[in-house]
Amino acid sequence: MSLERCQSEWTEIEQEYQQLQETHKVYRQKLEELTNLQAICSSAISKQRKGLKDLKQSLYKCKKSCNGKDSEVINDLQVQIKERQNVFFDMEAYLPKRNGLYLNLVLGNVNVTLLSNQAKFAYKDEYEKFKLYMTIILMFGAVTCLFLLNYRVTDEIFNFLLVWYYCTLTIRESILRSNGSRIKGWWVSHHYVSTFLSGVMLTWPEGPMYQMFRSQFLAFSIYQSCVQFLQYYYQSGCLYRLRALGERNQLDLTVEGFQSWMWRGLTFLLPFLFFGHFWQLYNAVTLFRLSALDDCKEWQVFMLALTFLVLFLGNFLTTLKVVHQKLLKNKDKVKNN
């Protein structure tokens, strides 16, 4: 290559560099403008929230001493206030916010807000794929430990994998909630309890008590993975249809339980879910009996019994509540028709 050609290429690169500098300068200015707008929006939302809270309290006091016509106006205002709060929730999904206690402990004060719908949906999609792949891996891991490798070291690897899986799920779910996902209630707490349970299983030392419960736990893990796979497969299809109809949010997630939106087309999963819930109760009863034996010296046995009982109560009562509410709504619809 001749020197003139090298100089020509350098001139071309230099021109592109100058253009890059100008573009980057504009980018920095826009970024500063964006940061200022975010601060203005966050401040305005906080101010609106405070105003609505005061108004809500005033309306509550007025309602006690008003006539029927005024009561209708107050009810209408209360409905609008509730709708406005939902709008604020959607707005905040695109604004930086302080992390909750859990994310602060794990990640520190890092901004985890994703600014575009595309980025939010991509992260949510990655979360769902992670759950699916790990469910399959855990199912094969439990099968291997139960039927092929009866060694403590393989059990420890499996239990460590469970701890890592549930820890990762809680972090990813917290990030999704910061970005507008409406997963809440027991289905958030469920993974924290599962993380604790897996951690206790990991610390349970080898011994007669462990061997007496080992096969039952691994069989339960296989069943749970199979049900979770079924749930992912059918819930993801159902969510896709509901999103296309505009009835569900883009960041709605598949869960390990039953929610009201699953009523159409997914009720066949209920027997599998209830069987899994009662298996958790059976695990709790088995462990309580083991903890009552004179030979039982490990604290993990009683702690696991309590944890399985908490999981059973949370899962069973939450699922039962959803089914009960849906049946009542259907009953009211029949009466109105």
Curated annotation (Swiss-Prot):
Record has Membrane as a keyword: yes
Transmembrane segments: 100-122, 130-150, 157-175, 185-205, 268-288, 300-320
Keyword vocabulary terms for this entry: Coiled coil, Membrane, Nucleus, Transmembrane, Transmembrane helix
Entry-linked InterPro entries: TMEM120A/B
Assigned GO CC terms: membrane; nuclear inner membrane
Main location: nucleus
Coiled coil ranges: 1-39
Record localization: Nucleus inner membrane
Mode of membrane association: Multi-pass membrane protein
GO biological process: fat cell differentiation
The family this protein is said to belong to: Belongs to the TMEM120 family.
Role description: Necessary for efficient adipogenesis. Does not show ion channel activity.
Name of the protein: Transmembrane protein 120B
Gene label: tmem120b
